[in-house]
Amino acid sequence: MVRRLTPVVLAAALAASVAGLAGGPAYASAGSRPVLSVGGEVTTAASYTAEQLAALPQATATVTVGGRQVTDTGVLLETLVTSAGPAYPASLLNTKNELLRVTVTVRGAGHRQVTFAVGELDAGFGNHPALLALTQNGHRIAHGPELVVPGDRAPVRFVPRVSRLTVGIATTPATDTNPAAGSPVEIIDGHHHVTLSAALLARLPAETLPVSFLGPSGTQTHTEVGPSLLTVLAAARIRPTLSTWVAAVGLDNYVATVTPAEQLVGGRPLQLSLNEDGVALAQPRLVTDGDVHGGRYVSGVVDIYVGTGPAR
C-alpha cells in the first residue's frame, strides 16, 4: 500500500538538491548489493538492497521543484527505525514515551549528515515525516536513495545517495527532583557546561507563542511566552548544526528530544516557555509548536543535553 503525504510546496532551491544527485556510483543493476545499512542502538541491525527497500510499505510526497511538481515515492524514515527496533537500556524499560529519546542520523554522499528526533517524525507526536525516496515521477532515482523532508521550508535537510542510518538513544543522568523554584537550567554539551539562571533566562528576547495540542484529557490551548530554544543555545554559546540534537530533562526525569533544525529548516518553533497563560512558571517548559500531541512538551526543565550525531 502506498501512503500519500500532504502535498507541500518547497522552495525552488530543491532543484539544486535534485541536480546534486548527478555523479557518484549508481545502483547495481541487479539490485543484489546492499545500498543502505541501519545500525547503532538497535535490536536488529540490517542491510537493504534496492529491491528490499522497494518491497517495504511505500509512501509518496508531491513537491514543487522549479515551478513544476514532482512526486517522490519511497520508505518513511520512521519505518526503517521501527523495523530495526531501538535497543533501550534496562533503565529505560517501561519509561513513559521512551520513543521520544530516540534519534536517527542519516548519512549520504560527501559524508553529508543530518540528525532527526524520531518524535518529530512520528505521526502521534510531531507528524513531520521524512521519506527515503526511491523513485521520482515513477522513475527510479539512478544514484541511490535520497532523503526528502516534504514539510520543510527549503531542502536543507535533503540528503542524496543515503547509505547509512544510525539510531541513537538519549540516556541522561537522573536529575535532582527537589530543586527550589526558579532553579537555573544546566546546559550540557559534552565537556561544555553552562548554567543559565532564571534571571538570565528572563532577560533573553522572548516570543509569544499560541499553541494547541492533544493532551490526556483532550485538546489543550495555551499562550506561551519565553525565549526560543535557539536563543537559549546561543546564550550558552552553542552553535547547532543539522546534526545537533537536544534532550530536555524535567523535574520528574521525563525526557524528550528535539533538533534545532526543526525550527531552522522545518519552520516549527521550539521554545523554553517562562510564562503560560499569563502565569509565571516555577521552572521553564519546553514547547514544541506544531506537534499534534503534547508528548514532547517537557515541564519543569532543569537540564538540557546537547549532542551531535546519534544520541547517547
What are these regions (language model features)?
Residues M1-A28:
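Secretory targeting and sorting signals
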Residues V2-R3, Y27-R312:
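N-terminal intrinsically disordered, low-complexity segments enriched in P/E/S/T
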